[in-house]
Amino acid sequence: MKVVTFGEIMLRLKTPENLRIMQSDGFEASYGGAEANVAVSLAMYEDKCAFVSKVPNNPVGMSALSEVRHYGVNTDYLVRGGDRLGIYFFEKGSDIRNTNVVYDRAFSAFSLSQPSEYHWENILEPGDVFYFSGVTPAVSKYVEDTVRSALKY
């Protein structure tokens, strides 16, 4: 049995300290996304897991892929294509100001995923756990259709 997670990995740009985006002249870059984070957490406990997504076939997409692989997550079923990785900007709250997150994921490689790009019959085996967050099918109609196709297996 393995856990298969399906979702978008994004470039996370965080303002330094507690600065707002408008106050910052730079960002700290990392990668994140609910399903990627779950896969990494499971891999750290040496559980068998795979992360399924779509990233652009460029240095940013390959860097995101490398980050997940670094923790021992299987990325064999990851699709490469599209033009851009989704981005989110993170402002840490302080005192009375709440944390703020701004998403820029329209037309990301993942949001344009097509069901035909994923061969679920080869990815999911009987007894596997399939994990996706509630946001995933809401990313786009294409992704919703892709989730529906996976659920048939």
Where are these regions (language model features)?
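C-terminal domain-closing interface element
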Residues: 88-98
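Glycine-rich phosphate/adenosyl-contacting loop at the front of the ribokinase-like
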Residues: 1-73, 110-116
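Glycine-rich beta-alpha junction loops
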Residues: 9, 82, 107
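A glycine-rich helix N-cap at a beta->alpha junction
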Residues: 65-85, 94
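A common structural microfeature
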Residues: 48-49, 84-87, 100
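Ribokinase/PfkB-type carbohydrate-kinase core domain
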Residues: 1-4, 69, 97-153
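Short beta->alpha junction loops/turns
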Residues: 54-57, 82, 136
